[in-house]
Amino acid sequence: DVVEHLKDLMKSMKEIHRVSRNNALVQIIVPYWHSSEAFYPDHKYFFNTDSMRFFTEKDRTYYSFPGYKMEKIVLIPSRLGWLIPPIPTPGFLFPNVLNLRHLFSYLLGQIIVKIDFRMRVIK
């Protein structure tokens, strides 16, 4: 729970990449954009499931930052969120939704409180 406080996320991710060994696992846990934790006054960034694509996808045309491979995205639910099962949703209907819990979070808020990104360093 540090990344959302950083002044320059791009520079910090480059530095993490620089000091890490090849194939190192980088785990970043941040508040989910639709939770109340995301809106603390000292937070500089908001994160959703697509936020780390800047650092993992080579086909971005407006900003290229190869060097990480996304291993896993874990949505950490609130107490209420645990009541909704993480059943997969059809990709053709909801291309940016990971599961039913994620969909309900868009609709109701406060279902997901944090996102856990796990990425491998590629050198």
Q: Residue spans of the language-model regions?
A:
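Conserved SAM-binding loop
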Residues: 1-34
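Conserved class I S-adenosyl-L-methionine
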Residues: 24-51
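A C-terminal cap/extension of S-adenosyl-L-methionine-dependent methyltransferases
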Residues: 64-123
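Short alpha-helix
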Residues: 44-67
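Aromatic-acidic/polar surface patches that form glycan- and anion
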Residues: 5, 45, 108
